[in-house]
């Protein structure tokens, strides 16, 4: 049960984090127990967690803010074991390093920083970036389908997740359809000139970019033209002297 002091402090922090949430972080207390907070971390860009959605829990002692909370993550993420207390400097593993001036925002910002790093601690796991990316991609679907605590605490995010997943699937399906077709490609003289008749060869050579580097086929065709022209010139020059 929350003390008056912890109740007052956590109520104040909820107002603060609602008005000014840290980047990639949101959090709210359980409607039935202010000592239990549910947070959501959105994977930052340019990390293996990009576009992932990670739900977890902070459990505060009644002595808060003089004692730290426990920290755990529920959504599979590839960085932390699920539903396992994490050993961080701002968690209940280290009450000796806890600072009462720290807040929920401070805790979650620190958790995000640790998550995107590679340090090891109790509760952390080691996986490849590919695994983290795969879990990030499936995280919204997992939260909606498998995470009852998430759906209870964040009904607005459940609805948004459905929209986001449907839009992503539509984009991927459209891209796959485009890739599976064989769109008409610009005619490549370098690959096809030898198969053309002389008239088409001449037309395509004229249409080529004057600044492009001639291909082997074009160079060979041009060389033949030069040789023929030289032969004709020599022929007429010979008869003009006779």
Swiss-Prot record:
Reactions catalysed according to its record: S-ubiquitinyl-[E1 ubiquitin-activating enzyme]-L-cysteine + [E2 ubiquitin-conjugating enzyme]-L-cysteine = [E1 ubiquitin-activating enzyme]-L-cysteine + S-ubiquitinyl-[E2 ubiquitin-conjugating enzyme]-L-cysteine
Q: What class of enzyme is it?
A: transferase
Primary localization: endoplasmic reticulum
Where located? Endoplasmic reticulum membrane
Q: What is its EC number?
A: 2.3.2.23
SMART domains associated with the record: UBCc
Cite the annotated pathway.
Protein modification; protein ubiquitination
Asked if the Swiss-Prot or TrEMBL record annotates the protein with the keyword Nucleotide-binding, the reply is yes
For region Disordered, the annotated ranges are 170-190
GO molecular function per UniProt:
ATP binding; ubiquitin conjugating enzyme activity
Instruction: Name the catalytic site residues.
Output: 87 (glycyl thioester intermediate)
Which GO CC annotations does the UniProt entry carry? Answer: endoplasmic reticulum membrane
InterPro entries, alphabetized: Ub_conjugating_enzyme, UBQ-conjugat_E2_core, UBQ-conjugating_enzyme/RWD
* Similarity comment text for this entry: Belongs to the ubiquitin-conjugating enzyme family.
Q: What is this protein called?
A: Ubiquitin-conjugating enzyme E2 6
Source species: Debaryomyces hansenii (strain ATCC 36239 / CBS 767 / BCRC 21394 / JCM 1990 / NBRC 0083 / IGC 2968) (Yeast)
């Amino acid at each position: 049960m929350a003390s008056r002091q912890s109740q007052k402090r956590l109520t104040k922090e909820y107002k603060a984090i609602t008005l000014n949430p840290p980047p990639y972080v949101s959090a709210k207390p359980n409607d039935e127990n202010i000592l239990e907070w549910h947070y959501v971390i959105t994977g930052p860009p340019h990390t293996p967690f990009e576009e992932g959605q990670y739900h977890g829990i902070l459990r505060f002692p009644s002595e808060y803010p003089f004692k730290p909370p426990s920290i755990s993550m529920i959504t599979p993420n590839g960085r932390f074991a699920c539903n396992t207390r994490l050993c961080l400097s701002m968690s209940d593993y280290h009450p000796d390093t806890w600072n009462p001036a720290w807040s929920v925002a401070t805790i979650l910002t620190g958790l995000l920083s640790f998550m995107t790093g590679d340090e090891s601690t109790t509760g952390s796991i080691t996986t490849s970036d590919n695994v983290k990316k795969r879990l990030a991609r499936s995280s919204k679907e997992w939260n909606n389908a498998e995470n009852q605590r998430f759906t209870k605490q964040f009904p607005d995010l459940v609805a948004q997740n459905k929209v986001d997943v449907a839009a992503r699937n539509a984009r991927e399906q459209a891209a796959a359809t485009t890739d599976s077709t064989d769109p008409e490609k610009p005619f490549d003289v370098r690959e096809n000139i030898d198969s053309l008749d002389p008239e088409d060869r001449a037309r395509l050579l004229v249409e080529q970019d004057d600044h492009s580097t001639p291909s082997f086929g074009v160079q060979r065709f041009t060389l033949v033209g030069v040789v023929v022209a030289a032969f004709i010139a020599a022929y007429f020059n010979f008869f003009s002297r006779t």
